[in-house]
Each structure stands twice: as structure tokens, then as C-alpha cells.
Amino acid sequence: MGKTHLLNSIGLELKKNHKVMFISAERFMYQFVKSIKANDMVKFKEYFRNTDILLIDDIQFMNGKEAMQEEFFHTFNALIDKGSKIIVTADRAPNKLSRIQERIKSRFSGGLVVDVQKPDYELRKNIVEKKIEELNNLYPDQIKISKDTKDFISNEITASIRELVGAINRIVSYSRIYNKMPNQAETKVVLKDLLNLNENKVTIDLIQTLVCKFFKIS
């Protein structure tokens, strides 16, 4: 499960018994700038500090935005002081966040840091099955996807949940538009850019292979 999906799931579960606010860092910045222009920062502060749990997605978006970081830092402290919780996601570990104030990174590192790994095969397979089932219910008798195609997608689209869902949507659209079950060759054409993206991903094994080849060592 990707970080955004996970954050959404956490929010939905906590919302049953708590006041929860879910927002992206980009949206937080938009609201911040809007409040400055309207000369109404009091309302902004009240809005974001009146919650039990604040969830912010893609916190790395704050990189280099000093004024925004300053306000976030004070919001963070205000919430913690009153016993609220804060959960943020980023595309890297706290100590790897560039152009983020050290005091903010220190706050992040002082909490529970969880590394969300890429989905394994079984999870990808379950997501493919579940997503196609949902789309079948939405478009009854319009989708024809073979087990081989499902297995191919589960095996080949490994980078992220977002790419996996995107691949499923493409194949389903192809099946509906052409009213046919796409074979593997057609599936490869439809997903060409995603497959290339995964094939070209630089890995430690690839680096080792290239270095050994360059220096002619084994």
C-alpha cells in the first residue's frame, strides 16, 4: 500500500472517534498564502489547530518555503501541546529532507518513523483482483481481462500502487473500448511507458553489474 493510500486509511479509521483533518502539503501552502493575502492568519491558525489529529501528505513539498515552514512549526507545537497527534508522509526519511529546517526534521525524527516499502507480489496481485472486481461491478459485462493479463500486470508493474492502479485502468479501458480481452502483446503496447519505467530503474544489482563489466571483474 502506498503512503497516500495508507494515510487515507488511517484518517478514515481515526475519524470514527476523533476530529481528523487530512490535507496535502501543497494544499496547506495554498491556504497559508490565501490567508496572508486576506490578512486573516488568525482564522488560518484556528482552522488548523482545532483538530485532534492532523494528517499531512507529501511534507517534502515544504522544501525551501521558509515562511510556510515557520507556520507549520508553530502549528506542530500548538497541536502537540494540547495533546493532538500529527502524522505526515514524505518520499524520503526525515534526515534526507533537503531545505527543511533542522528543528522540524528533529520533531519528525523524535516520533515514530515508518519506512513504507514497495508492494510485494501478493499485495500487487490482491490489488489487481480487487480493482478489476470493483470496475466489473461498475461496468457489468463490459470488461474482459484474462488471468494471464492480471498476472502479467502484477509481475511487471512494481514501482508503486499509483502506477499499478493506472495500469489496471488502462487495460480495463482498452477492453471496454475494443470489446475484447487484450493478449500479452496488446497489454505490453498499452503499458509500454510504465514497463519501460520499471525496466530502466537503477538498482544496486544493475550498478554492480555495470561496474564489474566496465572494470572487467567478476
Segments predicted by a language model, with ranges:
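Conserved catalytic/switch belt of AAA+ P-loop NTPases
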Residues: G64-R92, E102-R107
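Conserved small helical "lid"/interfacial subdomain of P-loop NTPases
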Residues: K118-S146
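Loop/turn-to-beta-strand initiation segments
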Residues: H18-K19, N50-I53, L79-V88, S160
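C-terminal helical "lid" of AAA+/P-loop NTPase domains
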Residues: E129-E133, D148-N155, R162-I177, E186-V189, ...
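Short glycine-rich substrate-engagement loop in P-loop NTPases that contacts/grips substrate
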Residues: N17-I53, I59, N63-E66
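Short regulatory helix/loop adjacent to the ATP-binding pocket of P-loop NTPases
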Residues: V33-K37, R92-G110
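Walker A/P-loop
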Residues: M1-M21
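Conserved AAA+ ATPase "SRH/arginine-finger" region at the nucleotide-binding site
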Residues: S98, G111-R124
